[in-house]
Amino acid sequence: MLNRRTFLTTLAIAPFASFPTQAFSQKTSGKIAISTWSFHNYFPNTRYGKPEFELAEWNLEKVMEVAQSKIGISNFELSSAHLASLENDYLIGLKKLAKDKGYNYIHLSDNMKGVNLSRADETKRAEDFKRFVELISVAEKLGIPSMRVNTGTPEKPDWDLAITIEQYKKLAALGKDKGVEIIIENHFGISADPVKVAKIIEAVGANISSCPDFGLFKSEPERTVGLPIMFKHARKVCSAKFHGFDEQGKPKDFDLENCYKVLKSSNYKGWVSLEYEGPKEPTAMLIKMKSLAQQWLA
């Protein structure tokens, strides 16, 4: 069994009040959502790699329209990088769109560039903290009940985790006042170690939980050990990442079906957010994955 050492190596709200978000509007897809990151190659600011389809420039509204009409899912994990603006007028429009179209914004994921809650410089760390405060306000205005906050990466090897924990304590307290739970995903930096994620969550105590990401492990043995640790503290959302399918139509690169078995054995009741990470056009990938997810969650 792997141990901890293995992982070490490895704003005004009133204008929004009249537009309540759609609550559990899904019919056939259960508590299945789509991460807008699945469509990252349609956004110039999040495009990377070598996409194997004809590129076009979409906005968030287009992504949600396609997901609802072609995939049959109206529940969305929004990437902060896909918000066209953080201004009130834009957010009011997104809130109204949810009401008009039956969309449900289930989670907001921080994809801000250059922020680091584990930065050594106290002044710069405080500046980064303010950016997370602003994003929590965005989640509140959109009626989103949870938000991913990345831990960042220590700039020195002997980083005192207590400093990072203190940042999360302050964010969790603020989020509680605004109806937004703080989420840590096994993403990068400190959070790449599920043991450290658990340590932070247990130290903070309230209004904080984990988001297990199926795909963000370096090896199958690490996934075998790390995923149950992440699910122990998961309540709101998990990232059901997948990399596409092989020639036999089976999920590529890792044992995805076993991830769903871990999910079920943990008695997890939150959202399952499908996230396609690959070079193909995502719509067909998500249609197929939705069918498999429904089968595995049954």
Question: Where in the sequence are the language-model features?
Answer:
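Acidic/histidine-rich catalytic cores of soluble enzymes
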Residues: 46, 75-76, 108, 165, ...
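Residues at the N-termini of beta-strands
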Residues: 75, 146, 237, 270-271
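A short helix->loop->beta-strand "cap" motif at the edges of active sites that frequently abuts
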Residues: 103, 180, 266-270
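Conserved glycine-rich "GG(E/T)P / GGGxP" loop and the immediately following alpha-helix
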Residues: 119-120, 125, 157-161, 186-189
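Short acidic/histidine-rich active-site segments
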Residues: 273-276
